[in-house]
């Protein structure tokens, strides 16, 4: 199946994210949407950087402290260094990573993600989060990841685009069901307990990008049935922060997340 055509006249969440992180893979529609969203929610760029740093800490922790060597990153977005495979292969060069996204521009830049350590492996899969069977059944995944061994699944800054809670739970359940015990799920999503985050979600919706802010209870429920590790579900900058990095004020962080294990 051919990938969807790239429409540069309509803003896309991945390209807005790229622009607000200082990237260059975006278009006028994305920049205009980003300006309107930041006007409504001025701390959004700070929060996005904090979320990216959270991904880095989570990936490093799972590789270094839990020995996970297989990673499935769904909703990859545009390349932003350090990418997940770069983080985990610094810990374990033999680590294997599969990236999943369905944005045409990400497809164009996939080669930038596929520079792997010689001992490891990195693959890219064009698929939609909502179609879990197409992800888990893909030849690219089967050639890279052994589902009989633990896998760390990364759903970072993507679940806010799944508006229905039942659908979000179904997606997570379908992903985790075939995974081996010892597998992990890392999530982050927009919190409803921050006025700036809620304003940002409203601004995204005004630009045609359906977005949901979740309560702490709703975020915690996404990890139901799993063994949550410390510090639990928290604002992303407070998840095992780097001791040598100044901690941002809670008021500027829009994302809440956590990491849990399948036992």
Please report, for each region that a protein language model flagged, where it lies by residue.
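Rossmann-like AdoMet
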Residues: 1-127, 131-144, 254
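Conserved beta-strand signature within the Rossmann-like core of class I S-adenosyl-L-methionine
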Residues: 151-155, 171, 179-190
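A short SAM/SAH-binding and catalytic strip from SAM-dependent methyltransferases
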Residues: 129-130, 139-169
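Short, glycine-/aromatic-enriched active-site segment of Class I SAM-dependent methyltransferases
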Residues: 192-208
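Core SAM-dependent methyltransferase catalytic element
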Residues: 232, 238-263
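Short alpha-helix
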Residues: 210-234
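Short "lid" loop at the C-terminus of a central beta-strand within the Rossmann-like core
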Residues: 158-161, 190-194
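Class I S-adenosylmethionine-dependent transferase superfamily signal
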Residues: 174-176, 223
């Amino acid at each position: 199946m051919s990938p969807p055509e790239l429409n540069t006249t309509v803003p896309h969440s991945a390209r807005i994210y790229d622009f607000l992180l200082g990237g260059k893979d975006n278009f006028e529609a994305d920049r205009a949407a980003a300006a309107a969203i930041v006007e409504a929610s001025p701390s959004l760029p700070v929060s996005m950087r904090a979320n990216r740093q959270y991904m880095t800490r989570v990936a490093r922790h799972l590789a270094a402290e839990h020995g996970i060597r297989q990673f499935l990153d769904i909703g990859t977005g545009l390349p932003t260094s350090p990418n997940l495979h770069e983080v985990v292969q610094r810990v374990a060069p033999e680590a294997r990573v599969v990236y999943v996204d369905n944005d045409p521009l990400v497809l164009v830049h996939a080669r930038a993600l596929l520079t792997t350590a010689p001992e490891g492996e990195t693959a890219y899969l064009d698929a939609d989060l909502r179609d879990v069977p197409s992800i888990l059944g893909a030849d690219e995944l089967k050639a890279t990841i052994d589902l009989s061994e633990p896998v760390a699944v990364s759903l970072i800054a993507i679940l806010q685009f799944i508006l229905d809670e039942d659908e979000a739970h179904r997606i997570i359940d379908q992903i985790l069901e075939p995974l081996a015990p010892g597998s992990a799920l890392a999530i982050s999503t927009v919190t409803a307990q921050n006025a700036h985050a809620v304003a940002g979600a409203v601004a995204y919706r005004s630009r045609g990008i359906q977005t949901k802010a979740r309560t702490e209870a709703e975020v915690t429920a996404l990890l139901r049935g799993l063994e949550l590790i410390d510090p639990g579900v928290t604002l992303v900058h407070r998840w095992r922060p780097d001791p040598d990095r100044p901690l941002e004020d809670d008021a500027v962080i829009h994302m809440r997340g956590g990491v849990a294990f399948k036992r």
